[in-house]
Amino acid sequence: MSEMTPREIVSELNKHIIGQDNAKRSVAIALRNRWRRMQLDEELRHEVTPKNILMIGPTGVGKTEIARRLAKLANAPFIKVEATKFTEVGYVGKEVDSIIRDLADSAMKMVRVQAIEKNRYRAEEMAEERILDVLIPPAKNNWGQNEQPQEPSAARQAFRKKLREGQLDDKEIEIDLAAAPMGVEIMSPPGMEEMTSQLQSMFQNLGGQKQKPRKLKIKDAMKLLIEEEAAKLVNPEELKQDAIDAVEQHGIVFIDEIDKICKRGESNGPDVSREGVQRDLLPLVEGCTVSTKHGMVKTDHILFIASGAFQVAKPSDLIPELQGRLPIRVELQALTTDDFERILTEPNASITVQYKALMATEGVTIEFTADGIKRIAQAAWQVNETTENIGARRLHTVLERLVEDISYEASDLNGQSITIDADYVSKHLDALVADEDLSRFIL
């Protein structure tokens, strides 16, 4: 898990997300508290439960982006789900327990990668020996068996040196590799994904591990052999236990669009995809045991972060029990023109940097001037005010419209330089921005 301090986490988030300091601080503290809890003695550690977070803010202000960036920083099992995909237990659709099953699968992949990386050095040595056995086959005795290993011959050592220096990378060899498991595609109804994955595992294990000869360049064979040898050094039972521990102690679940499962008005019939889902989420958030294919997972110490725009519904429309289990409330602010300007220039790999790089592949140089950036930000903000406010996502629409002609003609403009200033932006966008009907459909 991540050992970054809250200040370091916020600093890392600042590289990609503009503004929303309160939300960044809250998730940074929550992430650091995961590490702090693990430093306590076992008895007290069991009593410290995570303080779940509810992020409230209009669409396009950075709620989902915070989750995406947090997933990379956490170095812990992390899953992002949409609340609208689930239905109450007993009805057609996904059950909320599948969140924990998917989280366990994510943890399993993560710990497998870590275990393979841990054994990489030994795996590289073993892969090297297998390639050398193909290049210089070991001597056979009278019964056709490999003789007992002796001191490496001078020829073998010479080939080993060439192999390590990359001199043999493009040489083709034929080598036996583990055959890919038998692929069985099973169409399952919603809610039966767990049974499907178990059936697929059963069919894959029927064939056993078979070797299949393949002709490859040495550099490609080396990669596949390292993976194969590393997988042999990994203990599957230990992996399962490590994955379950990682989920229980460090797991993070991000539930997006939680406002869409709030009850709206009086309803006579069963509300299976709204209030029913909230009731099913309660035991997960409070703490229960969920059965997964890797083992039983306790959810007592999993951190839940929920987010929603709450434009139609209010946080108070959530059922009271769920409100109580999301004690930390963070409000994200709507973005201003200044925020749009910063979004266009400050983040690593900002939208303008992406467009410059894309056009550079055709030999076209694009330059955005300061007044051009300001005019783009103003246009995006103006369209948001007069039509639906979709936050920073509007910048993608406006910029795509702005560089459409350049993108189309880029292959004929090789070697040219184009400056996008306030006049260029006004020429291409003013008519659309001013006409509300046009901007509603085009921008």
Swiss-Prot record:
InterPro entries: AAA+_ATPase, ATP-dep_Clp_protease_ClpX, ATPase_AAA_core, Clp_ATPase_C, HslU, P-loop_NTPase. ATP binds at I18, G60, V61, G62, K63, T64, E65, D256, E321, R393. It is found in: Cytoplasm. Keywords: ATP-binding, Chaperone, Cytoplasm, Nucleotide-binding, Stress response. SMART domains: AAA (SM00382), ClpB_D2-small (SM01086). GO terms for cellular component: HslUV protease complex. CDD domains: RecA-like_HslU. One of its GO terms (biological process) is proteolysis involved in protein catabolic process. GO terms for molecular function: ATP binding; ATP hydrolysis activity; peptidase activity; proteasome-activating activity. It comes from the Bacteria. The keyword Heme does not apply. Pfam families: AAA, AAA_2. A double ring-shaped homohexamer of HslV is capped on each side by a ring-shaped HslU homohexamer. The assembly of the HslU/HslV complex is dependent on binding of ATP. NCBIfam families: hslU, PRK05201.1. Belongs to the ClpX chaperone family. HslU subfamily. ATPase subunit of a proteasome-like degradation complex; this subunit has chaperone activity. The binding of ATP and its subsequent hydrolysis by HslU are essential for unfolding of protein substrates subsequently hydrolyzed by HslV. HslU recognizes the N-terminal part of its protein substrates and unfolds these before they are guided to HslV for hydrolysis. This is ATP-dependent protease ATPase subunit HslU.
